[in-house]
């Protein structure tokens, strides 16, 4: 099969069949030409043994066409279009969708909304709570809500970083502003838990929350801190006491010099034209099988630890760190996590336009792994975790937060990697509207 290179073209000659491409001039398809009939093409392969690959025949190679990045998994259904980029999502028992519009880079009119139609929203639980007034106690209003979640007894919780949009990067939160608040589904405030002031040091940045209503006397809340030093917090919902664990350890901190990838482009963090590396720590969080799962956003790592261990005040920080389980890398940044009632954890793989999953219970194994067989009992050891792809679709533009209800997995998207802080010279390459979706998984929320 002769190969010739001339005048910047590469020509691969198969008999009288030739495919030409000029490097750097665009899509390969636009530079392909076919000189003879398919019969001539076939004649060039007259000596190919039966059963081997032939051009454009059955079993032809992957990557034959530019559009060969296929769709994996079930179809996704749009449920709401947003004019701003949301980070948080919840769904109540009536299938109402709630979204949060954070104030990380600027003010937003409403921090938390309920969707009233495919395109419309209104402030939730009220317009008055959305913005703190001059001199108001920041524990009584929204400063910078990051997420909203539904717990197992029908309460909606918001997690507020307490860091105003005008604060310098790395600033500590306002005391009283960093908090979680519980509401019933009519929007009535039930209780506010303020994060103690001594735990706000080093820029503690509350990002996401999950609630276990059955742990302890009145339940516990688990919160990821996505600051550079990072940590995982736990709040006793009985008395409000709070612990901050794993502070500034490798299991919550970003990879040094981390560079992500999105749609084929490398992603740095930019200050105008000054290049930096993203340092976002523990971000997404889920509770499943008695464990707390979290991912480190500026990495491809995720971890888990027993909920009981994390809240045990008798254990030292060193003992808690030693109990952390490392299942290995998962091939993507992970912006959000959620879990279902079968012990499956869903990982929102932002770099891959995908949602992954991993089973944590042996009873849910789909195939033998090492010495484990499907239908077993107990937890799957970390070394035997196999992360799989649930869905991959070009419409999944950085899935961020998700929730499961009545068999549906809901999630929002926000194109984070295309936002000004991750684009050269603070260019905003996002294109709205920002759509939230759902897909069928046939399972209920984690309890």
Each language-model region and where it sits:
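Blade-level signature of beta-propeller repeat domains, shared across WD40, Kelch, NHL, RCC1
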Residues: 401-447
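Surface-exposed loop and turn segments in beta-propeller and other repeat-based domains
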Residues: 12-20, 24, 28-43, 49-78, ...
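Beta-propeller blade signature
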Residues: 110-119, 174-188, 234-240, 425-444
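Short, conserved, GDST-rich strand-edge loop motifs in beta-rich repeat architectures
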Residues: 100-111, 161-175, 273, 414-431
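Conserved beta-strand positions in repeat-built beta-propeller and related beta-rich domains
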Residues: 99-105, 158-162, 221-227, 288, ...
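Loop/turn-rich, solvent-exposed surfaces of beta-rich toroidal or solenoidal domains
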Residues: 284-310, 318-404
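Beta-rich, blade/repeat-based domains predominating
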Residues: 80-93, 137-156, 198-221, 252-292, ...
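Asp-box/WD-like beta-propeller blade repeats and closely related beta-sheet repeat scaffolds
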Residues: 135-142, 162-219, 224-225, 230
């Amino acid at each position: 099969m002769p190969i010739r290179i001339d005048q910047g073209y590469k020509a691969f000659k198969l008999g009288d069949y030739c495919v030409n491409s000029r490097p750097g001039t665009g899509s390969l398809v636009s530079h392909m030409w076919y000189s003879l009939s398919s019969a001539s093409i076939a004649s060039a392969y007259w000596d190919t043994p039966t059963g081997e690959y032939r051009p454009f025949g059955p079993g032809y190679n992957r990557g034959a066409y530019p559009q060969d990045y296929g769709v994996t998994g079930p179809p996704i259904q749009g449920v709401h279009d947003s004019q701003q980029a949301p980070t948080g999502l919840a769904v109540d028992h009536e299938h109402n969708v709630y979204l949060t519009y954070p104030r990380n880079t600027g003010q937003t009119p409403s921090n938390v909304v309920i969707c009233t139609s495919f395109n419309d929203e209104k402030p939730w639980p009220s317009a008055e709570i959305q913005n703190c007034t001059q001199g108001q106690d920041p524990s009584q209003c929204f400063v910078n809500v990051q997420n909203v979640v539904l717990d197992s007894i029908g309460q909606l919780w918001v997690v507020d970083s307490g860091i105003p949009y005008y604060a310098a990067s790395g600033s500590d939160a306002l005391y009283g502003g960093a908090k979680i608040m519980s509401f019933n589904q009519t929007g009535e405030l039930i209780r506010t838990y303020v994060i103690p002031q001594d735990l706000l040091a080093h820029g503690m940045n509350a990002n996401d929350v999950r609630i276990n209503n059955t742990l302890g006397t009145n339940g516990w809340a688990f919160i990821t801190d996505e600051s550079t030093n990072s940590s995982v917090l736990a709040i006793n919902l009985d008395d409000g006491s709070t612990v901050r664990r794993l502070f500034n350890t490798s299991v919550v901190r970003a990879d040094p010099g981390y560079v992500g990838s999105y749609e084929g482009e490398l992603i740095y963090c930019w200050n105008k034209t000054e290049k930096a590396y993203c340092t976002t720590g523990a971000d997404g969080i889920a509770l499943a099988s008695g464990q707390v799962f979290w991912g480190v956003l500026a990495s491809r790592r995720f971890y888990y630890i027993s909920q009981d261990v994390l809240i045990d005040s008798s254990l030292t920080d060193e003992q808690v760190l030693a109990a952390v389980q490392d299942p290995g890398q998962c091939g993507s940044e992970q912006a959000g996590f959620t879990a279902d009632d079968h012990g499956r954890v869903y990982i929102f793989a932002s770099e891959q336009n995908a949602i992954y999953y991993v089973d944590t219970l042996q009873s849910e194994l789909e195939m033998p792994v090492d010495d484990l067989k499907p239908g077993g009992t107990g937890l799957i050891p970390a070394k035997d975790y196999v992360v799989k792809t649930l869905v991959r679709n070009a419409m999944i533009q950085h899935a961020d937060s998700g929730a499961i209800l009545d068999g549906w997995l809901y999630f929002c998207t926000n194109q984070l990697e295309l936002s000004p802080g991750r684009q050269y010279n603070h260019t905003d390459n996002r294109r709205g509207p920002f759509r939230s979706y759902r897909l069928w998984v046939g399972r209920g929320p984690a309890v």
